[in-house]
Amino acid sequence: MSNSIVIQTNSTVIEDMKQQYKHSLSPKTPQGGIFMAKVPSCTITAYKSGKVMFQGGRAEAEAARWQTVSQTPKTAVKKSVDSHRFAPPASIGTMSIVGSDEVGTGDFFGPMTVVAVYVDAKQIPLLKELGVKDSKNLNDEQITAIAKQLLHVVPYSSLVLHNEKYNELFDKGNNQGKLKALLHNKAITNLLAKMAPTKPEGVLIDQFTQPDTYYKYLAKQKQVQRENVYFATKGESVHLAVAAASILARYSFVKQFNELSKKAGMPLPKGAGKQVDIAAAKLIQKLGKERLPEFVKLHFANTEKAFRLLK
């Protein structure tokens, strides 16, 4: 018998959900709907009214992932994602800052990596000279060359959430947004402890969700960094600390990805496109479906697509 659960939430959480399910979105949206997504054993439909319906065998488990951040419905207000009380000051680009960024959240294969970096204001010219900028504009060779120098120049904290642990935490009701928040907070906390007694003038997080939602995700954590913490989208263009964090996160991710390919005994593609489905199907044939959680993020729609290719 198919279950059906409806929760009431707000526009911020719905936008977060849409981002979370971006690889599973259906081209069809019902009247009054914002999006429809299909994941294994569950269909999720979000409506403009703030209601979200979960249908299918895993409806209860899927809904549980979002209910903790949906307890206080708010009226949807049209405003910029950067319009909030946690926006950085105009002068932040010249300040001594801890910046954090993550890599691997949109890749079916490979881990999620988060890095926090401290850049003293006096180091900014040096980082520019090293070629530090958004890692998306650099190839793997450039990333490696810059990262190897950065490792000896800036204090940092690097965290890797491997696939098996990622899937385990996800199955316990932690959506990807919450996992990112936990890793960012932990990386920043670790770095601040490593730096002590030196204190940064602020902390800049490359914004992946609204700050209020970020702190809701951390509600049960014993240590939460709140002092002079700022959020901004495209944080790498706001301060070089985020750009440096992005480079070190990508460097770590690429190393982990190469190790994973060796473990698989075959080259693994990045991203979440059709080539990933084909590679996953080959991996299942080669190692068996029970080994899949070691290599992939199981909740991606690619899992179902890979199994379809084997039929």
Curated annotation (Swiss-Prot):
Disulfide bonds: none annotated. GO terms for molecular function: magnesium ion binding; RNA binding; RNA-DNA hybrid ribonuclease activity. PROSITE patterns: RNASE_H_2. GO terms for biological process: DNA replication, removal of RNA primer; mismatch repair. InterPro entries: RNase_HII/HIII (IPR001352), RNase_HII/HIII_dom (IPR024567), RNase_HIII (IPR004641), RNase_HIII_N (IPR024568), RNaseH-like_sf (IPR012337), RNaseH_sf (IPR036397), TBP_dom_sf (IPR012295). Manganese or magnesium. Binds 1 divalent metal ion per monomer in the absence of substrate. May bind a second metal ion after substrate binding. SUPFAM superfamilies: Ribonuclease H-like. Keywords: Cytoplasm, Endonuclease, Hydrolase, Magnesium, Metal-binding, Nuclease. It holds the Pfam family DUF3378. It catalyses: Endonucleolytic cleavage to 5'-phosphomonoester. Its cofactor is Mn(2+); Mg(2+). A divalent metal cation binds at residues 101-102, 206. Residues 95-311 form the RNase H type-2 domain. Its main location: cytoplasm. Belongs to the RNase HII family. RnhC subfamily. Endonuclease that specifically degrades the RNA of RNA-DNA hybrids. This is Ribonuclease HIII. It comes from Bacillus cereus (strain 03BB102). The gene is rnhC.
